């Protein structure tokens, strides 16, 4: 999506008139979606930017045009500098705008078309090579009207790697470590993923320990862990229940 970088509230308001609302506002160099927020007006934008700069002076702030109603997906891959091996593509159940750590996600994707999957694979390989990645990389995508948009790329191990490795029964962290140490190239490492049906990533929340936390989900992460559930197919009652409630906690 269209984006820009600002260092003051005045710059943010000026850029917002070019990008258009709604906007995703996020400070640089944070984890877990800290201080990220979706804003829908100049007043909301100015207030949030001032709050960020008060607590994080001299930090750059990223503004992205928010794709309302988009699906979110992510791909994990290993790159050895010459070759890229995509180890998993996951599709979130909640719409884009919910932090990836707070979303239910399904491996492999449950309703992405072949064209969209091909684009995700192509973009993942091109980005991994362009960044000169040696090891693991995680890339998050938003999909709307069969167009694939890049949200962010993180050339590191993501929280999804253990989930994918357990789902497919493959030692991906071990493979990535060998690649990073220069002990092996991808073509020298075995790759035989297998899974019957689908694996569902289930976010775990600790609201009973933090009763005063706002339970509305958004771009700032609130989960404290995750679990895994295997289902035979998409007719499974658990998947149907989660899918039917995918918009339940999405804040206005």
Predicted regions located by residue number:
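ATP-dependent carboxylate activation and anion-phosphoryl transfer catalytic cores
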Residues: 21-22, 31-34, 39-252
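A conserved helix-loop-beta module that forms one wall/lid of the active-site cleft
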Residues: 1-35
